[in-house]
């Protein structure tokens, strides 16, 4: 196996002048090419000009669209029959206050009421009156579940009156009959107290009297 051994260092003194002149010529050529390839100064300004032109075009388009929309909305409002009818109806009626300089008499200051508003006000008043009358009548017609009908009390009161009349007519009756009547009255009062419902919030005075007697 053969091994070739040589010097690893190069003698720079052996470089000829021709070799030194080559890099100079190459560098000069590269510099010319760089100068030839450099963009002109006008190309940078052309970008700004195109953007300004685009902005001007956008402004013109938006202004034309806004004018078209305004003209369309105005024509649409004029063509609507509702607005025309309302404007014709409220001509001269939108003043809520009268002018004192134009008024010659006190009668001119009075606001003229239209018959439609007057009729509407009367109808509303009649409806409210009917509702109030119906509500007041319903108070008496409604049945309170906590209250007991007064039929039993009325019957007992009538019987008491009858017994009193009999006592007036029979002044000459004996003491036995009066005792019997008293017993009947006691039974009726006890029966009446039994019929009337006694709740926690309401008590009858007769029940307390009976308790005291007992």
Swiss-Prot record:
Residues 1-66, 159-193 are annotated as: Disordered. GO terms for cellular component: nucleus. It is found in: Nucleus. Disulfide bonds: none annotated. Keywords: Nucleus, Stress response, Transcription, Transcription regulation. Probable transcription factor. Promotes slightly the tolerance to cadmium (Cd) and zinc (Zn) and to oxidizing chemicals (e.g. diamide and tert-butyl hydroperoxide (t-BOOH)). This is Protein OXIDATIVE STRESS 3 LIKE 5.
